[in-house]
Amino acid sequence: MAAAVAGMLRGGLLPQAGRLPTLQTVRYGSKAVTRHRRVMHFQRQKLMAVTEYIPPKPAIHPSCLPSPPSPPQEEIGLIRLLRREIAAVFQDNRMIAVCQNVALSAEDKLLMRHQLRKHKILMKVFPNQVLKPFLEDSKYQNLLPLFVGHNMLLVSEEPKVKEMVRILRTVPFLPLLGGCIDDTILSRQGFINYSKLPSLPLVQGELVGGLTCLTAQTHSLLQHQPLQLTTLLDQYIREQREKDSVMSANGKPDPDTVPDS
């Protein structure tokens, strides 16, 4: 009987070759959960805790170590151009003043630039990331503390300090920090004291006058002794002539005179 039932199922329920079954059974039930991590055995936990690697503490804290050097960056053409311009400014100008570049209006900046240009004083602005490396490698490295934030350079071929200070006084919110004149570093007070000095033609005139006076005094001192000697000789000759005339008039020698041997 079992064989007959199996034959009926094989013949009637099983699908024939090349045909899909009209009825398909689906299994419903619990599935294996693989999302949860399997708990480690307690003996293995003990073994892992005992054999855990403990790295040695460093002798110096990593925060105290110097940062690794950054890779050198390739210079672009603009930086090379600015560096050459900065080198030309410091080489061709005797006066270099450093000011704080405050937020001036375009009209005020243009007016001040025009007033400075009348006295052949030029206004230059360079980025600090290009200017500071140049100063570090030059003889002007003591000017580095002045370059904090946005700065402005006032340069001229001749030291026109008096004119520059007079123009900057009209702009009180543009502070003068310092600078250098003829490779001599000056502070703000040094620039003000320099502006109070007399002009070069006046000093040259005073120097020429002093030298002329000294020359005249030297000339008079050199002429004093010869003139005095000449006067004494003239007086001596005149006295001798008077004595000779007295002797010739009396016909006998003067008793005061002593004859030559």
Curated annotation (Swiss-Prot):
GO terms for cellular component: mitochondrial inner membrane; mitochondrial large ribosomal subunit; mitochondrion; nucleoplasm; ribonucleoprotein complex. It holds the Pfam family Ribosomal_L10. One of its GO terms (molecular function) is RNA binding. GO terms for biological process: mitochondrial translation; translation. Residues 1-28 form a transit peptide. Gene3D superfamilies: 3.30.70.1730. It is found in: Mitochondrion. The keyword Ribosomal protein applies. Residues 242-261 are annotated as: Disordered. Keywords: Mitochondrion, Ribonucleoprotein, Ribosomal protein, Transit peptide. Component of the mitochondrial large ribosomal subunit (mt-LSU). Mature mammalian 55S mitochondrial ribosomes consist of a small (28S) and a large (39S) subunit. The 28S small subunit contains a 12S ribosomal RNA (12S mt-rRNA) and 30 different proteins. The 39S large subunit contains a 16S rRNA (16S mt-rRNA), a copy of mitochondrial valine transfer RNA (mt-tRNA(Val)), which plays an integral structural role, and 52 different proteins. uL10m contributes a single cysteine residue to a zinc-binding site with mL66. PANTHER family: 39S RIBOSOMAL PROTEIN L10, MITOCHONDRIAL. Belongs to the universal ribosomal protein uL10 family. This is Large ribosomal subunit protein uL10m. It comes from Homo sapiens.
